[in-house]
Amino acid sequence: VSNGEEVFLGMNRLRLVFAVLAAVVVSCNPADDEAPSVFSLSFDFSQVDNGWTGDFADYPQGDSVTYELVFRHDTLPPNLNSNGTLKALMLSGNNMSDDLFMFVKKKITGLKPNTVYNILFNIRLVSNAPTGAIGIGGAPGESVILKAGVILSEPVKILDGDLYYRMNVDKGNQLAEGEDMMNLGHIGVAPNTTQYTAVFRNNNSGSPFRFTSGNTGEAWVIVGTDSGFEGRTTLYYTKIDILFNEVGPI
């Protein structure tokens, strides 16, 4: 099975899981007493940013211009946007340290307090990174790892003692997963391509992300890329779907 077929089959399987689990949802407010054990959140960025914000970490203080760091709700590339009206969350950076983290985040509410959830992510993004290519520090596709997580506190960058911006969450490092974020694959599209192409990445029901809510039922979603490729990476997030499957109280 080719990589493209694996992505297609994986997306079909995840869509089936989302459809079956969503069928049991009987309330739109997961915090109600009659709340369902399964619910999903869906964010489409084709017209609005839906309150998501972006930032960067793992770079030296004062080097945001040198690293060409840009986040904005921007128009999709022309080959995927024939009428010129479709937008996405765009992140771009020139990784000069062999370790640049680019991320988007959003606060969510309405979770059941002190409850364990199994979470599935379905991330749709646009990338022009080829697979099988050689780059400085790592490959432009396979060495840029997509990660996602749900955490209690707002994910922010902080300045460490070496005057580098680091994350206040455990995201792991490049291929290594962290306590707060799991790997969803790389951003590579296909061999020898430089054309922006839609990419779908997800985890499945066999490897959910485990999260325990706090007293308030509030949390933060974070999605980002951990790069070992020393060069420019530009990505467009078009849609983020998150499914929460309640396991039970702690």
Locate the predicted segments by residue.
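Bacterial Sec-dependent N-terminal signal peptides
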Residues: 24-42
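Extracellular glycan-recognition surfaces and repeat-rich motifs
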Residues: 53-84
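Short, surface-exposed tryptophan/glycine-enriched loops
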Residues: 163-217
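Surface-exposed, low-complexity/disordered Ser/Thr/Gly/Pro/Asn-rich loops and linkers
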Residues: 72-103
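Short beta-strands within extracellular/lumenal beta-sheet-rich domains
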Residues: 96-111, 201-208, 237
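A short beta-strand element within beta-rich, extracytoplasmic domains
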Residues: 116-132, 223-225
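Short beta-strand-plus-loop segments that form exposed binding edges in beta-rich domains
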Residues: 188-189, 204-205, 222-231
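Extended, low-complexity, turn-rich repeat/linker tracts enriched in Gly/Pro/Ser/Thr and Asp/Glu
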Residues: 125-142, 229-232
